[in-house]
UniProtKB/Swiss-Prot annotation:
The keyword NADP is annotated on this UniProt entry: yes
EC number: 1.4.1.4
InterPro entries from the UniProt entry: Aminoacid_DH-like_N_sf, Glu/Leu/Phe/Val/Trp_DH, Glu/Leu/Phe/Val/Trp_DH_C, Glu/Leu/Phe/Val/Trp_DH_dimer, Glu/Leu/Phe/Val_DH_AS, Glu_DH, Glu_Leu_Phe_Val_DH, NAD(P)-bd_dom_sf
Gene name linked to the record: GDH2
Subunit structure: Homohexamer.
Keywords annotated in UniProt: NADP, Oxidoreductase
Protein name: NADP-specific glutamate dehydrogenase
Catalytic reaction equation(s): L-glutamate + NADP(+) + H2O = 2-oxoglutarate + NH4(+) + NADPH + H(+)
Species whose genome carries this gene: Fusarium fujikuroi
Length: 451
């Protein structure tokens, strides 16, 4: 890929997958899969467009919009829209590439894609966000559809933005269809969708705890990063299951519980209310049981923890922070964010897993541990196609089953293709990457995408 412009985030995601495949027996047993990897690494389609809109003062503003339709072998392209000033093609290609294999692990018929714009919703009025969403959908509507490409939300795109985008699509297309997921409950949304990524992450970790003979969440100290949708609902589910959440964070710093303290459900709800208004964690009011650490992530400040769940953004756990978690006695790290750990951090975790046997820290990659969000998006698509709405229990039960299947797929594939010593925990990063890749590669081969 040396003749291409530098795309560090995408190259990291590609490197993680390629490394997992190379360091297993897969290519020895199936050398033809090297061809599949070369083909799968190139998006089927990249759409880039300008978005022109007016701010509240009547001034013209322009942003870049994107949709990467990476792989449609398993179903319609599926993946979120991100509105954030950092958005560029490399980040969206990385997210879209990860999405292909994450969606494969859900067992649902969904391809992989990702999109967004370098628009910053922070500090914008409701009217400005509405006008931007309408302008963005003017172009995007030409490229999506319920059987073609079904976007969802991501950073900067919540229920309000999905509503504006869906309304604009409906006007342009003159039809109602399940073209977006994350919709409101009264107009085609699914119960459990807002909670799905956070809940699914916790369900996945429950299977890890059980397999590693580490009990349940009861009495466990859990470090979380982020304070958005994923972190909020993961925290609430952990507390419900008897665990203690001892940290949250945002782009300005980390909020860490003092000795003997942890977050309550009421405090999590208060933080959620702040985040809806795009307010920082610095505005959160408490009685002194938390320490605010400016400009920091929580990992080196949380003290002894059992479980760490990075749930903010990519590359939020460095090599040094990974070592700090090992030293703090953590025995599970599972990503709620996409590619939450740097490659060097993963090396630390994997080296510990190989060295310490059953007592090791066990790491789970986001494409497996956070696939609950897109899984329930897929369930929303299924409900839309039938014009029905399942109960909360029906959706939650299906989510638990999907997370179990994703865990088992990674576990069993690792046991099949990755050499391990007696008593060593299987490599979930290798197993999940290989399991997702095989499913996509076989579908592509059947459809003539490689031969």
């Amino acid at each position: 890929m040396s003749h291409l412009p530098q795309e560090p985030e995408f190259e990291q995601a590609y490197g993680e997958l390629a490394s997992a495949l190379e360091n297993s027996s897969l290519f020895n047993e199936h050398p033809e899969y090297r061809t599949a990897l070369a083909v799968a690494a190139i998006p089927e389609r990249v759409i880039q467009f300008r978005v022109v809109w007016n701010d509240d003062k009547g001034n013209l503003q322009v942003n870049r919009g994107y949709r990467v339709q990476f792989n449609g072998a398993l179903g319609p392209y599926k993946g979120g829209l991100r509105f954030h000033p950092s958005v560029n093609l490399s980040i969206l290609k990385f997210l879209g590439f990860e999405q292909i294999f994450k969606n494969a692990l859900t067992g649902l018929n969904m391809g992989g894609g990702k999109g967004g714009a370098d628009f910053d919703p922070k500090g914008k009025s409701d009217a400005e966000i509405r006008r931007f969403c309408q302008a963005f959908m003017t172009e995007l509507s030409k490229h999506i559809g319920a059987e073609t490409d079904v976007p969802a939300g991501d950073i900067g795109v919540g229920g309000r933005e999905i509503g504006y985008l869906f309304g604009a699509y409906r006007k342009f297309a003159n039809r109602w269809e399940g073209v977006l997921t994350g919709k409101g409950l009264s107009w085609g949304g699914s119960l459990i969708r807002p909670e799905a990524t956070g809940y699914g992450l916790v369900y996945y970790v429950e299977y890890m705890l059980k397999h590693a003979n580490r009990g349940t969440f009861e009495g466990k100290r859990v470090a979380l990063s982020g304070s958005g949708n994923v972190a909020q609902y993961a925290a609430l589910k952990i507390i419900e299951l008897g665990g203690s959440v001892v940290s949250l964070s945002d782009s300005k710093g980390a909020l860490v519980a003092k000795e003997g303290s942890s977050f309550t459900p009421e405090q999590i709800h208060n933080i959620a209310a702040l985040k809806i208004k795009h307010q920082a964690l610095t505005t959160f009011e408490h009685d002194g049981q938390f320490t605010w650490i400016e400009g920091a992530r929580p990992w080196v400040h949380v003290g002894k923890v059992d479980i760490a769940l990075p749930s903010a953004t990519q590359n939020e756990v460095s090599k040094e922070e990974a070592q700090a978690l090992v030293d703090a006695g953590a025995f599970i790290v599972a990503e709620g964010s996409n590619m939450g750990c740097t490659a060097e951090a993963i090396d630390v975790f994997e080296a510990h897993r190989k060295e310490k046997g059953a007592e090791a820290l066990w790491y789970a990659p986001g494409k497996a541990s956070n696939c609950g969000g897109v899984a329930v998006s897929g369930l929303e698509m299924a409900q839309n196609s039938q014009r029905i709405q399942w109960t909360e229990k029906e959706v939650d039960d299906r989510l638990k089953a999907i997370m179990k299947d994703a865990f088992v797929a990674g576990l069993e594939t690792a046991q099949k293709y990755v050499e391990a010593k007696e008593g060593e925990l299987p490599s979930l990063i290798a197993g999940s990457n290989i399991a997702g890749f095989i499913k996509v590669a076989e579908a592509m081969h059947d459809q003539g995408d490689w031969f």
